[in-house]
């Protein structure tokens, strides 16, 4: 059973009297950021700068948006059409980028260990990398909005978007065990609650996200204070988001970060954290109105795992 921690809604960025950093007598472990599906290295530049401010030397795996088209090679594999696709050799290009980033970060590691930060698919790709190539250099895997779990089989209307890749991860990668030698931390966002496309989709969010506060508010919560036309538009988006959630976890009316459901971003055996008001991607995010996992005020909620 994993350990779960629920953190109160993310506060708006504000000046702090001090920022926790590594002590002058010891350097932090360096961190390697692993981009999510469709993202490129540049999307994480601001996160890299934020981590550097905490004293965490950071390397971002070298990935471009065009690189992701390499995955189309999987279409030639019969396992793709059977839904039993394996990560290798289709994703070997990504594992090579992980390896190159780790080699670049090693000289920055005072004690020979480093942290992996996997965003979205980068999190489960890190798990495959650790299984295939070893993890002697890794002391922390921190995942941000990673869909760790495969969708339920034989669920009506659900198609495995990974074509079996997450089933492979579930069946072949070691179950996380949070230990002093290797820590697993899984961070999930609660940005918007999905809704079923048909049927009763009313969502009462007053008890989840306070509306009359200085906190960023999830999009479903905004329905309480908007005009009817805007509420209908927001409700329709909740249904669309819910259909996305359903393809990942088999349920539409659950909370998530707008792309990955909260329940899919947690792992048994890991330290699981949920953050209210946190959006999935750096693309389309806004540090004030739509903060993502790498926004400064959100990083503050998980940075201590890299500093310890």
What residue ranges belong to the model's regions?
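Lipid deacylating catalytic domains
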Residues: 2-308
């Amino acid at each position: 059973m994993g350990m779960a921690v629920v953190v109160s809604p993310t506060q708006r960025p504000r000046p702090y009297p001090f920022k926790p950093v590594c002590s002058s007598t010891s350097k932090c472990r360096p961190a390697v950021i692993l981009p999510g599906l469709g993202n490129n290295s540049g999307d994480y530049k601001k996160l890299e700068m934020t981590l550097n401010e905490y004293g965490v030397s950071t390397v971002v795996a070298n990935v471009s948006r065009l690189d992701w088209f390499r995955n189309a090679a999987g279409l030639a594999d019969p396992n793709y059409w059977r839904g039993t696709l394996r990560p290798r050799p289709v994703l070997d290009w990504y594992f090579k980028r992980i390896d190159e980033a780790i080699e670049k970060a090693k000289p920055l590691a005072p004690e020979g260990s480093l942290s992996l930060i996997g965003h979205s698919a980068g999190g489960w790709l890190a798990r495959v990398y650790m299984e295939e190539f070893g993890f002697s250099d890794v002391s922390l895997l921190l995942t941000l909005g990673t869909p760790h779990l495969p969708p339920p089989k034989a669920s009506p209307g659900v198609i495995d978007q990974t074509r079996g890749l997450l089933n492979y991860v579930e069946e072949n990668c070691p179950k996380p065990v949070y230990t002093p030698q290797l820590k697993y931390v899984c961070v999930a966002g609660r940005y918007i609650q999905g809704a079923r496309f048909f049927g009763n989709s009313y969502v009462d969010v007053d008890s989840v996200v306070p509306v009359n506060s200085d906190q960023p508010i999830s999009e479903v919560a905004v329905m309480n204070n908007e005009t009817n036309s805007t509420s209908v538009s927001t409700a329709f988006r909740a249904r669309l988001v819910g259909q996305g959630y359903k393809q990942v976890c088999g349920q539409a009316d659950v909370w998530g970060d707008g792309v990955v459901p909260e329940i899919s971003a947690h792992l048994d055996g890991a330290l699981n954290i949920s953050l209210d008001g946190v959006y999935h991607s750096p693309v389309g995010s806004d540090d004030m109105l739509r903060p993502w996992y790498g926004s400064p005020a959100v990083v503050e909620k998980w940075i201590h795992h890299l500093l310890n």
